[in-house]
UniProtKB/Swiss-Prot annotation:
Annotated protein name in UniProt: Chorismate synthase
Family: Belongs to the chorismate synthase family.
Cofactor dependency: FMNH2
Keyword Amino-acid biosynthesis: yes
Catalytic activity: 5-O-(1-carboxyvinyl)-3-phosphoshikimate = chorismate + phosphate
Subunit structure: Homotetramer.
Cofactor binding note from Swiss-Prot or TrEMBL: Reduced FMN (FMNH(2)).
GO biological process assignments: amino acid biosynthetic process; aromatic amino acid family biosynthetic process; chorismate biosynthetic process
One GO CC term on file: cytosol
Record-listed FMN binding positions: 123-125, 241-242, 281, 296-300, 322
Source species: Helicobacter acinonychis (strain Sheeba)
EC annotation from Swiss-Prot or TrEMBL: 4.2.3.5
UniProt KW Flavoprotein keyword: yes
Length: 365
């Protein structure tokens, strides 16, 4: 499927080397002021070609809004938008058009559909994620109206892990590093991977918090069974290229603990810890929502690798082109956008949870 969300629905289209990629964001309430500066900044954060740690492919990524906005406000109708692909280099893929690149989607796409766009991976390329970031910017505009902000940074590159989390530093960092002290070591790990014609994995941390530091997030976002907030978050994140694991709160570490070590105790002021990552019973509990995203190493590496062609013959594959040495860096921005989309969707869903909410809306008339 090509659609994410239920009340706020994003449908995307387009391929890596097609003329355009685009999206339709349906369900956005009317009357939201469109923050064009925010939209542009979000696109720049994801943009390649900014430094030596991302893909050299640098697209302008100018978002062309085609519908759903009038005089700088959302109209309540579907917001349509396009991004033109201007710097694709399809010739880089001529030598692999009949080969399956190791650990790419080539093999599965070909066997499922019987045809594949070999140019940059076609629909399976992370190029499509530019649309998710644009849509996430619109979702952020909605969330800002009710005091919710999402932010992200890099926790780990290879085995080099941040010891301190500084989201303000991440915004200034070339690799969105959360820990200034570990940043140079993490950069060295990426440089070494590039030098060896290799790639490296990483972990991103995404969090949602109240816009006002002394306030809590809304309680009750999500549903108890089939629309659990953590399940929807995991679904959105796992739908992005290269994501192999998603943790909420303590995540994997939870399986090593006893209940007495894990439980978030409470007093009259609220929770004394946040090992649950801000979600209990599939619903937000008011604490910060904490999500860790584990990315595999970029499968596009510049080493000769054994593979097969579309006829099943064994052969060698040596890639050309422009690729990220570490998916996690720009992927952190995409996942931040995805969390924004999920939360905005859940905010709209929550309007149906109590009759008082509906009475407030309809009794005003």
């Amino acid at each position: 499927m090509n659609t994410l969300g239920h009340f706020l629905r994003l449908t995307t289209f387009g391929e890596s080397h097609g003329s355009v990629i685009g999206g339709v964001l349906d369900g956005m309430p009317s009357g939201i002021k469109i923050d064009y500066e925010l939209l542009e900044n979000e696109m720049k954060r994801r943009q390649g070609g900014r430094n030596a740690f991302t893909t050299p492919r640098k697209e302008d990524d100018k978002v062309e809004i085609t519908s759903g906005v009038f005089e700088d406000f959302s109209t309540g109708t579907p917001i349509g938008f396009l991004i033109h692909n201007q710097r694709a280099r399809s010739k880089d893929y001529d030598n692999i058009k009949n080969l399956f690149r190791p650990s790419h989607a080539d093999f599965t796409y070909f066997h499922k559909y019987g045809i594949r766009d070999f140019r940059g991976g076609g629909r399976s390329s992370a190029r499509e994620s530019a649309i998710r970031v644009a849509a996430g910017a619109f979702a952020k505009m909605l969330l800002k109206e009710i005091g919710i902000v999402c932010e992200s940074g890099i926790v780990k590159i290879g085995g080099i892990e941040a010891k301190n989390y500084d989201f303000n530093h991440a915004l200034k960092s070339e690799i969105f590093a959360l820990d200034k002290e570990q940043e140079e070591v993490q950069k060295t790990a990426i440089r070494n991977a590039i030098k060896n014609h290799d790639s490296i994995g990483g972990v991103a941390l995404i969090r949602a918090r109240s816009l006002k530091r002394n306030q809590k997030l809304p309680i009750g976002l999500g549903q108890g069974l089939y629309a659990k907030l953590d399940a929807r978050i995991a679904e959105a994140m796992m739908g992005f290229n290269g994501v192999k694991a998603v943790e909420i709160g303590k995540g994997i570490e939870s399986s090593l603990l006893k209940g007495s070590e894990y439980n978030d105790l409470m007093n009259q002021k609220g929770f004394l810890s946040n090992r649950s990552g801000g979600i209990l019973g599939g619903m937000s509990n008011g604490e910060e929502i904490i999500v860790k995203i584990h990315f595999k190493p970029t499968p596009s590496i510049f080493q000769s690798q054994q593979t097969i062609d579309i006829k099943g013959n064994e052969c060698e594959c040596l890639l050309k082109g422009r690729h990220d040495p570490c998916i996690a860096i720009r992927g952190s921005v995409v996942c931040e956008s995805l969390l924004s989309l999920v939360l905005a969707d859940m905010v709209l869903l929550n309007l149906t949870s109590k009759i008082e909410y509906l009475k407030t809306i309809y009794n005003e008339n």
